[in-house]
Amino acid sequence: AQSVPWGISRVQAPAAHNRGLTGSGVKVAVLDTGISTHPDLNIRGGASFVPGEPSTQDGNGHGTHVAGTIAALNNSIGVLGVAPSAELYAVKVLGASGSGSVSSIAQGLEWAGNNGMHVANLSLGSPSPSATLEQAVNSATSRGVLVVAASGNSGAGSISYPARYANAMAVGATDQNNNRASFSQYGAGLDIVAPGVNVQSTYPGSTYASLNGTSMATPHVAGAAALVKQKNPSWSNVQIRNHLKNTATSLGSTNLYGSGLVNAEAATR
């Protein structure tokens, strides 16, 4: 049987699905550790920019988990994603260790821009700024990609890069009580929050796992962006980002929560 993870319900994705909005026709690049073949995922393509790891299969688990939150299929098994009909692309920029280079991430963003991706999910970050990475975010944005990035997990009162760059949509994490997760980095530049604690999703080996992190929050927003793009195909990435913020459910302090909790129901009304 299929179960609906708490975060999928909390962001009110099923209400959008009931309107026929499932992310159909929307291309989402997952810049991560790759995505493993899985019965609950439909991977349309991708590329690897990790030296020595030419396959887009996931040797870590992180990318497969992120992908399921975006687009786990609406079928009779496993879990359900925010945008189950979105087109997933596995863009490997992190190796099996879970880490990667700025140059790999920049190449992944360039691939997203070159290949007509509507959304790029970057559940990754660094405390250090990089001119190369900032330029890659800006370039992808100028080519129509909505770059969605994790705020970081150090709990600090400033957010990671590339999330902190103006053209990246920075996502923090909340728990089941709609409180900021203790690890979720916050501060200037935080755009929005989403569920990031005890998030159940797909995992390599045709299995499932529960993970914590702003990495898990970010794909809820990438998925919601896909729903909005399907409903409003002419909208730009900037319009989609602003709409997700304007329709978010306020949770109080913008320093801690940005515009609030992403709300797929309100965003697809």
Curated annotation (Swiss-Prot):
<feature type="domain" description="Peptidase S8">
    <location>
        <begin position="5"/>
        <end position="268"/>
    </location>
</feature>
<dbReference type="InterPro" id="IPR036852">
    <property type="entry name" value="Peptidase_S8/S53_dom_sf"/>
</dbReference>
<dbReference type="InterPro" id="IPR015500">
    <property type="entry name" value="Peptidase_S8_subtilisin-rel"/>
</dbReference>
<dbReference type="GO" id="GO:0046872">
    <property type="term" value="F:metal ion binding"/>
</dbReference>
<protein>
    <recommendedName>
        <fullName>Subtilisin Savinase</fullName>
        <ecNumber>3.4.21.62</ecNumber>
    </recommendedName>
</protein>
<dbReference type="InterPro" id="IPR023828">
    <property type="entry name" value="Peptidase_S8_Ser-AS"/>
</dbReference>
<dbReference type="GO" id="GO:0006508">
    <property type="term" value="P:proteolysis"/>
</dbReference>
<keyword id="KW-0479">Metal-binding</keyword>
<dbReference type="InterPro" id="IPR000209">
    <property type="entry name" value="Peptidase_S8/S53_dom"/>
</dbReference>
<feature type="binding site">
    <location>
        <position position="168"/>
    </location>
    <ligand>
        <name>Ca(2+) 2</name>
    </ligand>
</feature>
<dbReference type="InterPro" id="IPR023827">
    <property type="entry name" value="Peptidase_S8_Asp-AS"/>
</dbReference>
<dbReference type="GO" id="GO:0030435">
    <property type="term" value="P:sporulation resulting in formation of a cellular spore"/>
</dbReference>
<dbReference type="InterPro" id="IPR034202">
    <property type="entry name" value="Subtilisin_Carlsberg-like"/>
</dbReference>
<keyword id="KW-0749">Sporulation</keyword>
<dbReference type="InterPro" id="IPR022398">
    <property type="entry name" value="Peptidase_S8_His-AS"/>
</dbReference>
<feature type="active site" description="Charge relay system">
    <location>
        <position position="62"/>
    </location>
</feature>
<feature type="binding site">
    <location>
        <position position="165"/>
    </location>
    <ligand>
        <name>Ca(2+) 2</name>
    </ligand>
</feature>
<feature type="active site" description="Charge relay system">
    <location>
        <position position="32"/>
    </location>
</feature>
<comment type="function">
    <text>Subtilisin is an extracellular alkaline serine protease, it catalyzes the hydrolysis of proteins and peptide amides.</text>
</comment>
<keyword id="KW-0720">Serine protease</keyword>
<dbReference type="InterPro" id="IPR050131">
    <property type="entry name" value="Peptidase_S8_subtilisin-like"/>
</dbReference>
<feature type="binding site">
    <location>
        <position position="163"/>
    </location>
    <ligand>
        <name>Ca(2+) 2</name>
    </ligand>
</feature>
<keyword id="KW-0106">Calcium</keyword>
<feature type="binding site">
    <location>
        <position position="40"/>
    </location>
    <ligand>
        <name>Ca(2+) 1</name>
    </ligand>
</feature>
<feature type="binding site">
    <location>
        <position position="2"/>
    </location>
    <ligand>
        <name>Ca(2+) 1</name>
    </ligand>
</feature>
<keyword id="KW-0645">Protease</keyword>
<keyword id="KW-0964">Secreted</keyword>
<feature type="binding site">
    <location>
        <position position="75"/>
    </location>
    <ligand>
        <name>Ca(2+) 1</name>
    </ligand>
</feature>
<dbReference type="GO" id="GO:0005576">
    <property type="term" value="C:extracellular region"/>
</dbReference>
<dbReference type="GO" id="GO:0004252">
    <property type="term" value="F:serine-type endopeptidase activity"/>
</dbReference>
<feature type="binding site">
    <location>
        <position position="73"/>
    </location>
    <ligand>
        <name>Ca(2+) 1</name>
    </ligand>
</feature>
<feature type="binding site">
    <location>
        <position position="77"/>
    </location>
    <ligand>
        <name>Ca(2+) 1</name>
    </ligand>
</feature>
<keyword id="KW-0378">Hydrolase</keyword>
<comment type="similarity">
    <text>Belongs to the peptidase S8 family.</text>
</comment>
<feature type="binding site">
    <location>
        <position position="79"/>
    </location>
    <ligand>
        <name>Ca(2+) 1</name>
    </ligand>
</feature>
<feature type="active site" description="Charge relay system">
    <location>
        <position position="215"/>
    </location>
</feature>
<dbReference type="Pfam" id="PF00082">
    <property type="entry name" value="Peptidase_S8"/>
</dbReference>
